[in-house]
Amino acid sequence: MAEKLVIVSDMWGARKGLWITSYLGYLQQYFDITFYDSQQLANLDLTVNSEENIHNSFVHGGIDTAVAHLLKKEKAPCHYLAFSTGGTIVWNAAKKGLPVKSLYNVSSTRIRMENDKPAVPVTLLYGANDTFKPEETWADMLGLEMQVMPNYGHTLYSDEKVIKKVCLDLLQQVTKVAPTTKKAV
């Protein structure tokens, strides 16, 4: 039976998330996948879906609401892949008891404000040009390693090269499936 993988979107949810289909395409043959739209987890219902309005809604209660809903929905230990705000949601839910086998966070910048980490295996990936990525001193303080990809910004997770990297990382970490390479003859 396949391992369960829960994917939690960035703040835009499925609305601007066509890139998420690439992750699903790569990973669905290896995992039993559940997808959560961060806006739906947070019960956001905004008249104007501007970046500022969405961000403020998450910061002022939406993240906490999403954490509570995720805790109610997921009871069995599984793996998580989360993007930006979605990563903050899973990070905080894991600290409150969400059963997490592993957490792969991509561009989760708000966790830089946290002074403690969940007691689960965490992978952190950021773009070097992401203005709000955590500092190395923060990662050192929490005993975490951050992977930083040069020449990428906050939305690196929507780039096909990064999508392939993240999917391969997950496959190697979780399923222990090594990539097949053709030998030169």
List each language-model region with its residue ranges.
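A conserved short beta-strand
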Residues: 98-110
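Short, conserved loop/helix-junction motifs that constitute active-site signature segments
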Residues: 97-98, 113-120, 139-142
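Catalytic histidine-centered segment of alpha/beta-hydrolase-like enzymes
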Residues: 151-162
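Serine-hydrolase catalytic machinery in alpha/beta-hydrolase-like enzymes
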Residues: 2-73
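Short beta-strand/loop motif that positions the catalytic acidic residue
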Residues: 124-126
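Gly/Ala-rich beta-loop-alpha elbow adjacent to hydrolase catalytic centers
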Residues: 81-90
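Hydrolases whose catalytic domains are alpha/beta-hydrolase-1, hotdog thioesterase
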Residues: 89-93, 114
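Conserved loop-alpha-helix segment in the C-terminal half of the alpha/beta-hydrolase fold
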Residues: 133-145
